[in-house]
Amino acid sequence: MNYKLTITLTALLGLYGCQQEADQAAATAQAEQNSAQTVTEVAAVTSELVSGIDQSGFDESVRPQDDFFDYVNGAWVKETEMPSDKARWGTFDALGEQSQRDVRTLVEEVSTAEGVEAGTPTQKIRDFYNSYMDAEAATAKGVEAIRSDLEAIAAITNLDGVYSAFSSLGMYGVNTPIGLGIFSDMKDPDVNAIYVVQAGLTLPDRDYYLKDDEQFVKGRQLYLKYVTDVFDLAGFENGSDRAERLLDLETKLAEVMWTKEENRDWSKRYNPMNIDQLNQMAPQINWAVGFESAQIPIDSTFLVSQPSYFEAAGKILSDTPLETWKDYLSFQTISTFAPVLGEQFSELSFNFFDKGLSGVDEQEPRWKRAVDSVNENMGELLGQLYVERHFQAESKARMDTMIQNLIKAYEVSILDLDWMSEETKQQALDKLHKFTPKIGYPDKWIDYTKLEVVDGDLITNIKNGRTFAYNREIDKLDKPVDKTEWGMTPQTVNAYYNPVWNEIVFPASILQPPFFNVLADDAVNYGGIGAVIGHEIGHGFDDSGKRFDGDGVLRDWWTAEDAEKFDVRKNALAAQYDGYDVIDGLTINGQFTSGENIGDLGGLSIAYLAYKMSLDGKEAPVIDGWTGDQRFFLGWAQVWRSKARDEETKRRLTVDPHSPPKFRANGAAVNVPAFYEAFDVKEGDGMYLPPEERVKIW
């Protein structure tokens, strides 16, 4: 039973898909130079332009009426070299890289500190970072660093030992078939609840095990090689035979898992059970043993996300030979720690997760992985340092004003909807007025006093960090929900909506150009951060978020007729995205990406309305030859400036609920009438949709 701090468990709906979480080894100096140069270019996009529009990326050979993304970003896409240690590169990634470098500066300032008192933040950051940077020590220890864990697995004599290991290893983030998480009860958000969810796959999605498309067949081949190589390097015999058995086991698990589309329905995923009901659902699983090892009281109520999975998984668990489960646990444990077990194991991990599945050419330099690991284990300690140096107080004040303007615009739009009844409108407005914004950084920081960091022992530090995070969650079980907590650190370039707390959250790092520029006029800011704000508010009213009310309670507040009308519009938008050919005949999954597409369309539409309201009837100035409306849409399109390796694009089409950036830019714009007026889009143009085919939801 593994505990993971995941967006899936906590129902956080982020603006941008996170990069694959995998530690990688050293990259070349050229990669760093390329990254730094591009970061500088992107960070300076608007600093010298009153309009806030970076025209250097424009492709003048493309008409904005035919392909708006390519017009705004085409030259940048053609001329920008992909950093060798990246699967994708664009606005988000460049700002993320800059944030990473800013954090590195902060970390390295304390990494040489002397005479530091034990237990202080400086000591913890210094010793954790330095232990990671000691590559020679990691290579010298190799798999021996986790030998005690492997010996404990080898000593297991029955399935009860397997269930116990699911929990004890799960505390360290080891992947197992039973996932546990602690978060607000979706029907009683002030109470913490225990969620039980399907888990346990190594490949990115069940499709990789069950479908025969080229990328999935290749994925299975990569899996077999990776598992074989891991076993061989760790000193196990017959690695290829073990790999075949594990692929068979994970395929059986994949067959009974819910699809990503099914997992979007939170009402079906809310299934409260006590221990007796769990035993009745899956009698083959010794739930009590697992929960005891996980330090969870067995008299708790458990919210089971996918009951049919556990019914079938119980049979798989009991029918699978014990030795296969021990191999599974051994492999998953080694794979979890492989990036920090020395050069050879790190290379195996990189070759599978990054090079094989995402097409990355070279491993990241060790300092990047070290910074990421410190961020993972004590992110809010670094966050405090980051905010002190890099966040401007005036940004918070201006963001708060924009958020209130977006909420006012949503109110106007909801009242004006011609397809929604007054009854549902009032419920929607009640929810809208209960949104809680969080901007920049937490009011209350995590207390890391109980986190022990030792000098020169990387594996112990990582285990301590993950155990600390696990214990913080367990401690919540007998306490009220603390809604001051954040799901992202201030140094994260992203934003999110949490439906159970009905909050929209904007970390400090996203409040910079091209999203938010204090030097630019309002048009580009409403097209950038304004649309981001609108996007996150829109998640409260997408096909998933609309199931929660203003207090974060999972309940149906829609009339049946209004719900049906919403679905008609949602399905029409999904059909549009289904028709976008992305790469090699592969298209977007419109239903899977539905929530993000609704967020984009609502965000852009409402941000435009808020921008027009901010003008208070005045005419916007023409700046750099662009009208205010044109600058608004140009600001929107330049936010999505991005490119990706083919393998990464294909992977994301399978696992990422966000559409590819180009289709986020174009897909929303073609449904907004003001875009047609701003750029004189007419029938026959590539960006033209007949009025009757344009979708308006909010």
Locations of the language-model features?
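C-terminal motif of bacterial Sec signal peptides marking the signal peptidase cleavage site
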Residues: 14-17
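Hydrophobic/aromatic-rich, well-ordered segments within soluble, folded domains that form packed cores
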Residues: 58-78, 209, 213-232, 594, ...
